[in-house]
């Protein structure tokens, strides 16, 4: 695959995005709304995540949890190639429930990088099962491999339980942004929503999300823009509808964070090849 290419593949299971990629791009700090797990096929990269700075080389498993702030850069000019599956939390939740025997409703990947040949082999089999159509026994193979892979790589026994999560005070400030990221918001607004001082809001945001309030707002706007684009909204409308000044503003943020333009992402969302 040529460097700089992101190739989406048709996926048999709803709520799963399969991508084969090759890139020399240095990704800025960003988050995903999905769980991501993949294998580096060529080259190597360094990345900072909520679980520390790591390096991944060919054959390694790479993972990311929803909302986890991370970046990524190749270790040399040759770049790196990888395959990755992104899972909506609704896909992962029942697997975690089964693996934990009902103890957890959602888990998280334990490590951002794993050097585990067995898990890598299982992932590649799962990637093939997810992208090879709907044979008579495809669902059984797919579901079995998914459960095996997540049982090996995800902590489902100490996952999030009811009543756990973000402290209630800052949760109100997060909700102020999450409810409609397109609406302008000030630090004063967030302080009033949470009942905290502006400085307390800054510290609490960093503890809860790893981002400043402004960076969190921009990320949530990008998340909203991605959903609008995936639903077929014109790019200019998606930009305005998600709170950006215009399409060029959205495009600059998109490229910095994800290494591809909104129009390229639209192609991925509709299953078209990126060339």
Located regions from the model:
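N-terminal regulatory/effector-sensing and dimerization cores
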Residues: 2-104, 135
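Amphipathic alpha-helical segments enriched in hydrophobic/aromatic residues interleaved with Lys/Arg
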Residues: 98-162
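Basic, amphipathic alpha-helical hairpins
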Residues: 127-136, 152-160, 173-186, 205, ...
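Amphipathic alpha-helical interaction segments
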Residues: 141-148, 168, 172, 189
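C-terminal regulatory/oligomerization modules of transcriptional regulators
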Residues: 148, 272-275
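Conserved catalytic core of the tyrosine transesterase superfamily
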Residues: 165-171, 188, 200, 275
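N-terminal positioning helix adjacent to the helix-turn-helix/winged-helix DNA-binding module
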Residues: 165-173, 209, 218-221
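Basic/polar phosphate-binding segments, predominantly the helix-turn-helix DNA-binding elements
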Residues: 178, 183-220, 239-268
